[in-house]
Each structure stands twice: as structure tokens, then as C-alpha cells.
Amino acid sequence: MKKMLALACSLGLAASLMTGCNSKTEDVAASTAASAATEAAKTETPAAGSGTMIALITMDSIDQHWVTLNEGAQKAAGELGVTVQFMAPNTKDDAQQIECVNNAVSAGAKAIIVAANGPDAISSALKEAQSSGVKIVYVDSPANVDAEATFSTDNKAAGKTAGEEMLKALSAAGVTSGSIGVINVNAATDSCVMREEGFRSAFEGKGFTLLERQYGEGDAAKSQSIAENYITQGVVGIFGCNEGSTTGAGNAIKASGKDGIIGVGFDKSDAILGLIDDGYLLCTMAQNPDVMGAKGVEACVKALEGDSLGGAVSDTGVSVLKK
């Protein structure tokens, strides 16, 4: 499996860009991103097509989930003749993500595809972007502002599936009671909140105790520390709500040397697949970020061409990946 490449390029569209919001430009239009931004500021461009820049703003630039989402967006951009500028904070940070939105508007983005880290925090910036005529499309995690369309996993249903998979494994091992640890990202990210809600619903009336969730901010090292603490409490299972928390949980189970702790999580990465192959994680709920990225670009182009998408919410699906 190929190793993940962290994206840490700086945005070169405007001299006024501040630090904290990373970006990666991939030329899909004939001109460079810099000249496209300059021309966008000076002249009118077609609703969609050559010279049209769409900003893709994810929660961070590190998780393989976002890298794959960007790959899907870039492929669609090439097919549709637009430019997608990938912009993301170095880490999951509301202030940096807001900065990315403001930078995108200043750079002349006609549309913004966004995965909101904090739905409330980013909403004002998105409203200001809309007031400037920028089209908004959500992928993975929406904010609290009406958008052209949303493409995401049915996170509550997928979370319940994760819980059901853990229950089946516990039952097969003859475990009918015990404590379950839950590692989430934060209290605001809607997608992860829904995953936890769905996961907990699977255990209702099943005789297990789900411990109070702990927040690892999507960071694998922090999540591993949380998982290690859960393990010292004697948990029989640990659920990770995203890539970082799942990786951390698997690494903690591996480091503990203990058998019988069932680890279940979300997202697909080389690290997670390796932990599954080695038996430290039972399974992961693999989303389809490439589909989210591609559909997001397609929706932006349609909206810029005047089509009404009606704020439709589309489920991009999930698969259970096991050994």
C-alpha cells in the first residue's frame, strides 16, 4: 500500500494570505492558478469552465481521508475544465479554517467545497462568502448555512453499523458485559457526533456500559493516550470516530499486548488497514471520500451554470473493511 503524503504547500494566489491555511494547487485549466485569480478579480469569467476556480477546504491537510477526497475533486475538475484549489489548515482548527474561507474569497473562488470542522464557528464566514456570490457545497460534514448540496456518509447509520460489528465480535468471544471506550474528535464536528450517536444506539439494552467519550482532536498520538487510559480501566472494546482516533485506538491495543479488546473505527488509511491485517483492529467503516470530492465539484459546476440543486443531501455510502 502506498504511504500517505502529507500536503503542506502554501497558497500562492494572493500576497495577503496568512500562515495556518495550507493549500495545494493542481493546474487543471491552461493558465496558472495565480493568473486565474488575478483575471477573476479584474474581469468577468464564464459561469463555469476554463478560468473558473473552486476552493476545496477540508478539516486538515494530513488525514488520508482528505487527501483522497482531493484526488476525487481534482479528477472531476480535469474532466469538467475547472481548477480546484485544495486549501486546509495544518490541523483541525476553526480559526484556520475560517481563514481558508476568507482567503478563497479574496483569491476569486467562484465556489467553495467545504468539510466543516466546527459547524457554528465557520458559518459566519460562509454567509459572507455567499453574500459575495460564492456558491457553497458541503462534503463529509456540513455547517449551519444553507448550501447548494451536501455529499456525505449517513454517519448515524454507519456508526450504528460499527456498534453492531463490535457486538457481534464480543458475542463470538463470549463477552456479554463490560465497558466500552469512545474516542471522538470534538463536540462540534457534526459527522463525528452522529457517528458516536449511532454507535451508542447499537448498545442500547445490551448489557454493556459505554464510558464517557474523550476527545482526541483527531490526533493519533492524543487518541492513543486516551485509548491506553481506557485499557487500564479494563475496557472490552474501543470505538474511534475518525481516522486519527481509530489509528490511536489500534496502536494502543497493539502496545498493550492484551488479547480480547475489540477495536472498531472509521476511515481507511494505510495505518488502519495495517492494524486490521495484524489483528489489532476488528474493522473500519470505510467512506468514499473520492466520490464526495468528485460530486462536490460536479455540483459546483452545475450551480455556477444556473442549475438549482435544492440543497439536496446525498449519501455517498460506506463499506465495512475487515481482515
Residue locations for each model-derived region?
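A residue-level marker of the well-folded mature domains of exported/periplasmic proteins
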Residues: 2-7, 21-323
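C-terminal motif of bacterial Sec signal peptides marking the signal peptidase cleavage site
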Residues: 16-20
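Repetitive helical segments and hydrophobic/amphipathic motifs
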Residues: 11-12
